[in-house]
Swiss-Prot record:
Pfam families (UniProt xref): Ribosomal_S2
Skewed-composition ranges (Acidic residues): 243-260
InterPro entries named among the record's database cross-references: Ribosomal_uS2, Ribosomal_uS2_bac/mit/plastid, Ribosomal_uS2_CS, Ribosomal_uS2_flav_dom_sf
Organism: Oenococcus oeni (strain ATCC BAA-331 / PSU-1)
Designated name of the protein: Small ribosomal subunit protein uS2
Signal peptide: none
């Protein structure tokens, strides 16, 4: 069964690209035609590539990969946060801080600061401070939450990055590539497909299209991890059955020895 239907793509407006004068020629093979100065994306290719991306992401999730969702423009912020949380993965949906991946140790220090402020707020420590100091710490926490809240539980750099609009998220993509982190991206007609490992050509400026593709990537992660959990449960059951069998064997052997 296909991950996405043609009807879903059409209803979401996934086929509308950018103005022809703003295109990146490297996206030519994913363009069907142009109408009224707008490129139209070949949704037959989008269907196939979205399906390939779904299966690839599902496989990575089944193998235990950690994911990071990135989408900081206004059309993507809500979908990125909602779907990342649903899939239980890290996300960045406001400005990408340079060095988030390539200078992870420094970022981790700031995340630890955020966690300290969270704890202080929760245990009532802020209430014991002078109003001015409490206000300053509150503002500091709010700023850290905005930019780092989505990656606060990320223990290390991710194994895979999903991006909405790699042109907008150019710095994030470059950091990922420098660390050999595979990039899965929803890419429009103005993007450079050569910077992306797993491509899904689609309108990355339409909120409904962004929500559709992002939700499918979240679905793939959830499905892959459920398969991983099922495999772990199966392995545990096999081990338990084996242990029970060994217990039966030992009991049988003891009985035979007693009879002898």
């Amino acid at each position: 069964m296909a991950a996405i239907s043609m009807k879903e793509l059409l209803e979401a407006g996934a086929h509308f690209g950018h103005q022809t004068r703003r295109w990146d020629p490297r996206m030519d093979e994913y363009i069907f035609t142009s109408r009224n100065g707008i490129h139209i994306i070949d949704l037959q290719k989008t269907l196939r590539m979205a399906d390939d991306a779904y299966n690839w992401v599902k496989g990575e999730a089944a193998d235990g990969a950690n994911f990071l969702f990135v989408g900081t423009k206004k059309q993507a912020t809500e979908a990125i946060e909602e779907e990342a949380k649903r899939a239980g993965v890290a996300y960045v949906n406001h400005r990408w801080l340079g060095g988030t991946l390539t200078n992870w140790n420094t970022i981790k220090t700031r995340i630890n600061k955020l966690k300290e402020l969270r704890a202080a707020e929760e245990d009532g420590s802020f209430d014991k401070l002078p109003k001015k100091e409490a206000s300053q710490l509150g503002k500091q926490k709010a700023k850290l939450e905005k930019f780092l809240g989505g990656i606060a539980d990320m223990e290390d750099i991710p194994d895979v990055m999903f991006v909405v609009d790699p042109k907008t998220e150019e710095i994030a993509v470059k950091e990922a590539r420098s660390l050999n982190i595979p990039v899965v991206a929803m890419i429009d007609t103005n993007g450079n497909p050569d910077l992306v490992d797993v491509k899904i050509p689609a309108n990355d400026d339409a909120i409904r299209a962004v929500k559709l593709i992002t939700s499918k990537m979240a679905d793939a992660i959830i499905e892959g991890r459920q398969g991983q959990d099922a495999g772990e449960d199966s392995a545990e059951k096999t081990f338990a059955d084996t242990a029970d069998g060994e217990g039966d064997f030992e009991e049988s052997s003891n009985n035979e020895n007693q009879e002898a």
